[in-house]
């Protein structure tokens, strides 16, 4: 009987950890959006002030996403490179696997216009994208805080229910 109680406790703890793991995708989404947002200003400086070619400006980025797009660019537009990276990286375990549709849509709109117009239009594009990514990042932060507790609690509750059934 004591062994069953110990096993029931372990089962409850494992279910709580499973709930916490499910919430990890929300933290990854928040991290990817925050990183992309932080990388916009340095990219703008490299493109508009240092006047680096788009591919070089992207490849020099500290952000993994922008760097991947830059590496995929030879012979392609920024949008084509983004689409190629998105297809590869949205698969399970990829850099973008935790992004929501609206996150990908905002990034696609950014890459669709990146490097396609004059400096003034590019400044407006960077400002618009920074605002949109900031909003999405704030939503991801709020969602992460709320749902991490929820998923952990649901996992613990499920584990407790299974433990009761096991004992």
Language-model-detected regions and their locations in the chain:
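Short, non-transmembrane cytosolic segments of multipass membrane proteins
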Residues: 85-120
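Juxtamembrane/interface alpha-helical elements of multi-pass membrane proteins
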Residues: 2-75
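Charged, amphipathic alpha-helical oligomerization/scaffolding segments
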Residues: 35, 42, 106, 125-128, ...
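Helix-adjacent hinge/juxtasegments
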Residues: 58-99
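Bilayer-spanning, highly hydrophobic alpha-helical transmembrane segments
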Residues: 7-18, 140-167
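Membrane-interface, cytosolic juxtamembrane amphipathic helix immediately N-terminal to a transmembrane helix
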Residues: 101, 112-157
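Residue-level recognition of alpha-helical structural elements
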Residues: 29-32, 54, 78, 103, ...
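Charged, low-complexity, helix-prone segments enriched in Lys/Glu/Asp/Gln
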Residues: 18-33, 86, 133-152
